[in-house]
Every structure is written in C-alpha cells, then in structure tokens.
Amino acid sequence: YRFKKTVKEEICSLIEGFSLPEQYVGCQIRGGDKFIEYDLLSVDLYLRKIKEVTDLKNVFVLTDDYEIIKCLRKMAPEYNWFTFCQSDEKGYYNSAFSKTDPLLKRKRMIHFFASMELLERASLMLGTITSTPCLVLGIRKLGNVHWVDFEKNEFFPSIDYSIAKKKTLTEQFLRRK
C-alpha cells in the first residue's frame, strides 16, 4: 500500500510529535465489535507474552478501546504505555463508525495508519491471527512477530483459513497454554 502525499504528511507529522523511544514493543489489542467473530483476548495474555519474550518496558498499543490502556497501566505500572487511542474511544463498532462525522472519521483513520506504521517500526511485535492488521504486519515483519494465540511456524498457512477455522485454532492453542 502507498499513502497519498497529504495523508503521508499527516501520518509523519503525528508520529514525529509522538515521544516514543527508539526501542519498543508494539501490539494490537482489539475491543469493540470484534467479539462478534472471536472471543476478545485478555490483556493478561499480552502482558505474559511481553514478559516472556523481552525485557523492553516501552510498549506501543494499537487499540480501539481506551479501557484497555487503563487496564494495562493498572496491571503493569512498571511499563511505559503509548497509544493514539483517545480516552473517549470505547471500541470500534462498524455500524457506528459508518455514521461518524467525516472529519472525525478521517482523524481516526490517520491515527490508525500512524499506529500501523509504528507497529511496523517496533523492535518486536505481538499479534493475534484473529486481527487483520496483525496479519498484514505479520507478513510485512515476517520473523519479528510473536503470536499470543498461535504458533509462529503455523502462521503462513493460517492466512487463508476461514474465520471459523482461525477461531478453532486459537481456542485450541489457548487451551494448551
């Protein structure tokens, strides 16, 4: 993908104004309407994985629900949590987003694209196969993604799996943990 010049400039400006350290972990934790397709993954699952794979204490989180950020800060205050998610965001619901004011919709999309760029730049990333942004970044970052709900060596075959099959595999993986 390639951004239009004006969009790229907005993304770059947003990132430049963000005081993120050079070395950091990136992850996406979904809320909102994702529960329609999959059970939402617990914040604790991400915290355990971060502690398992790195000593880094700076974490950028792409999320659509500010409650997740509040929960992370409460559960792991020793970490520095970064996000573009605003305190009024309570999860992405497609039906509501489609009715959002165009200027606010554009702002949220710029934040999303900037978040994707920051996840791609992360020293390492935590992802889930139940999330399209994570799947895209999993392909782009190849070996630099740690899956919270899947074995690393099973990733590429999973790209073509149906939602139902991914859900089943994720549930089986989490039961083994």
Q: Where are each of the predicted segments found?
A:
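Residue-level detector of alpha-helix boundaries and kinks
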Residues: 57, 103-107, 122
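Leloir-type glycosyltransferase catalytic cores
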Residues: 153-177
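A polyampholytic, Gly/Pro-enriched intrinsically disordered region
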Residues: 99-112, 172-176
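A donor-sugar binding/catalytic signature common to diverse glycosyltransferases
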Residues: 112-154
